[in-house]
C-alpha cells in the first residue's frame, strides 16, 4: 500500500510537470496569417522589379523570410484554387469544390478544420472560399473560418475597390481573442478583381506600365493595368496595417505569414487559362522560428505544399489526404529538401456560365523545371466561352459573349476592334480554339506565346512531361483522365448568373 502511494504521488508529480510543459508549449504555438489577393499574377510586385506596381509590405515579408519565385496556384479560377489550398488536394480530387460556383462538401477536411479542433481561434475577412454555396455542402460556416466583415470604410479609396475595412476586421478578431490563444486568420482581399474605375491617368504614369505580350499595347490596356496596380496597392496597404497590429500585440515574430494570390490577373488569356499568367502567383513567407531572412527560392511550389506547411507549423500531424510537401524544413534552412525536378500541378473545370448546357473548358497543367505542359481534353470547345449567347430567345450579335473573360475595357476593345490588323492578333490569342496539348519553356517564354508541342527538338521532353502529367492524373483519380469527365459537367452551378447558348453545331 505504501509503495502504491509513493508511485501514485510520483506519477502525479510527473503528470503535473507534463501538463505544465504542455500548457507552456500551447501558449507558444505559432499563429498563422494568410493574406491572399484576388486575381494577381506573379510579375506584379515591386519585389519582382515591376515598374508600375508597389507592394512594400509584401516585399517586407519576403525580406524578413522567403520569396518563392515559382509558386503555382491550385487553379486559374477563384473557388477551386482556394479549395485546393484549404484541403491540401488538387482541385480534381475534391469533387464539386474543384469547380467554380458549386458546393464544398463537409467531408473534405481543411486545415482550418484541423486548427480549430486543436484550439486555434479561426477567422477571415473579405473573400474566404468562394464563389459557391458552402451550406449546400453541409458546412456551418465558410471553409476559410468565422466571418469578420462588419467593419466598413466610410468611402472606398477608388471606384471598384471594396468598402470592407480588412484591417479593422482583423483588429476586431484580435480583440476577441483570449489571452494566449493561438490564432489563424485569412485576409482575403477582393482586390485586384474586376471591375475597375476605368478613369484616366497622367501620361507619365501610363508610360510606366509594362504591357504583357498577350495584350495589345494600347491606352486601354495601360489604363486597365494601372487600375489593376492601384488595387494591388490597396491589398498591400491593409496587409501593412495587419503587420502593425501583430507587432503591437507582440505576435509578429510568433506568426507564420503567407502572402499570395488565388490565381492570375483578370485579363484575357490570363485568369481562367492554364498559361503561366493564369496560375503563376506571388508568394512571400515569413517564419521567424527558422531564422532565415531574404532567401529566394526558385524551385516550383504549389498550393498543396502550403497546406501541408500550415499544418506542420502548427505542430499537427499532416493528414494522408494532404498530398503536398511541407516546406517547413525549407523555412528552417534546409533548402535542398525541395528537389529541383519536383513537379507542381494546377487545373480547371467550369469557370463561369459560358457554354451550351453550362459545359466547362477543362485543363490540367504541370510545371517542372523550366517547362509547362498543358492538357485541354475538350479542344473543340472555345477556351474563353461560346462567342454568342441567347438573350430573350434571340442570338446575341457575333463575338459578343466569351464570358470566361471578365468584362473589362481590354475585353471590349478586343471584341469591338477585332478586325483591326493589330488588335485582331490579340483577339484570336484570347478566344480561338486551342490544341489538346501544348508545351512551353516558361523560363524563356513566360507569356506562353511559343508552343513547343510540335517542335521535333522538344519531342522527347514533351512526351516525358505528357506522360508524367497523365500518370499523375490517373493515380490521383482525376475523372477526366479516367474517361468519366461527365462527372464534372453534372456538378450544379449554385452561385453566379446562368446564361443560355446555342448548341455546339451553331455556336460559331
Kindly give the residue locations of the regions a language model identified.
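Formylglycine-dependent sulfatase
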Residues: 2, 9, 14-19, 23-438, ...
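C-terminal helical cap and adjacent loop that interface with cofactors, partners, or active-site loops
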Residues: 443
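Short, charged, surface-exposed hinge/linker loops at domain edges
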Residues: 482-495
Amino acid at each position: 500500500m505504501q509503495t502504491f502511494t509513493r508511485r501514485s504521488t510520483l506519477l502525479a508529480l510527473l503528470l503535473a510537470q507534463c501538463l505544465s510543459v504542455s500548457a507552456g508549449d500551447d501558449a507558444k504555438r505559432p499563429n498563422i496569417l494568410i493574406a491572399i489577393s484576388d486575381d494577381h499574377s506573379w510579375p506584379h510586385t515591386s519585389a519582382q522589379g515591376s515598374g508600375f506596381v508597389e507592394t512594400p509590405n509584401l516585399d517586407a515579408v519576403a525580406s524578413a523570410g522567403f520569396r518563392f519565385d515559382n509558386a503555382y496556384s491550385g487553379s486559374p479560377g477563384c473557388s477551386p484554387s482556394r479549395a485546393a489550398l484549404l484541403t491540401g488536394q488538387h482541385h480534381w480530387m475534391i469533387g464539386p469544390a474543384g469547380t467554380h460556383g458549386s458546393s464544398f462538401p463537409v467531408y473534405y477536411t481543411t486545415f482550418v478544420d484541423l486548427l480549430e479542433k486543436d484550439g486555434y481561434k479561426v477567422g477571415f475577412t473579405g473573400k474566404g472560399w468562394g464563389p459557391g454555396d458552402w451550406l449546400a455542402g453541409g458546412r456551418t460556416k465558410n471553409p476559410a473560418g468565422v466571418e469578420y466583415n462588419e467593419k466598413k470604410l466610410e468611402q472606398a479609396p477608388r471606384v471598384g475597390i471594396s468598402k470592407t475595412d480588412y484591417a479593422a476586421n482583423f483588429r476586431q478578431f484580435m480583440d476577441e481573442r483570449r489571452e494566449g490563444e493561438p490564432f489563424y486568420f485569412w485576409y482575403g482581399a477582393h482586390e485586384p478583381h474586376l471591375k475597375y474605375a476605368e478613369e484616366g491617368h497622367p501620361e507619365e504614369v501610363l508610360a510606366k506600365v509594362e504591357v504583357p505580350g498577350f495584350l495589345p499595347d494600347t491606352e486601354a490596356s495601360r489604363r486597365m493595368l494601372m487600375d489593376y496596380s492601384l488595387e494591388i496597392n490597396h491589398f498591400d496597404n491593409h496587409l501593412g496595417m495587419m503587420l502593425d497590429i501583430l507587432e503591437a500585440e507582440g505576435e509578429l515574430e510568433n506568426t507564420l505569414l503567407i502572402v499570395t494570390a488565388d490565381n492570375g490577373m483578370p485579363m484575357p488569356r490570363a485568369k481562367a487559362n492554364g498559361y503561366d499568367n493564369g496560375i503563376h502567383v506571388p508568394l512571400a513567407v515569413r517564419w521567424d522560428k527558422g531564422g532565415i531572412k531574404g532567401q529566394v527560392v526558385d524551385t516550383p511550389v504549389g498550393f498543396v505544399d502550403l497546406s501541408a506547411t500550415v499544418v506542420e507549423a502548427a505542430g499537427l500531424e499532416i493528414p494522408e489526404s494532404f498530398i503536398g510537401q511541407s516546406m517547413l524544413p525549407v523555412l528552417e534552412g534546409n533548402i535542398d529538401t525541395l528537389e529541383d525536378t519536383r513537379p507542381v500541378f494546377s487545373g480547371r473545370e467550369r469557370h463561369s456560365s459560358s457554354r451550351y448546357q453550362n459545359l466547362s473548358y477543362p485543363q490540367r497543367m504541370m510545371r517542372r523545371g523550366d517547362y509547362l505542359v498543358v492538357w485541354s481534353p475538350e479542344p473543340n470547345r472555345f477556351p474563353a466561352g461560346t462567342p454568342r449567347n441567347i438573350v430573350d430567345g434571340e442570338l446575341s450579335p457575333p463575338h459578343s459573349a466569351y464570358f470566361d473573360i471578365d468584362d473589362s475595357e481590354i475585353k471590349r476593345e478586343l471584341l469591338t476592334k477585332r478586325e483591326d490588323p493589330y488588335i485582331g492578333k490579340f483577339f484570336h490569342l484570347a478566344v480561338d480554339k486551342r490544341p489538346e496539348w501544348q508545351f512551353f519553356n516558361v523560363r524563356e517564354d513566360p507569356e506562353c506565346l511559343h508552343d513547343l508541342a510540335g517542335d521535333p527538338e522538344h519531342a522527347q521532353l514533351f512526351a516525358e512531361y505528357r506522360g508524367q502529367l497523365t500518370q499523375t492524373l490517373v493515380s490521383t483519380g482525376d475523372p477526366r483522365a479516367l474517361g468519366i469527365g461527365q462527372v464534372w459537367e453534372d456538378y450544379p452551378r449554385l452561385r453566379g448568373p446562368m446564361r443560355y447558348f446555342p448548341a455546339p453545331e451553331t455556336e460559331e
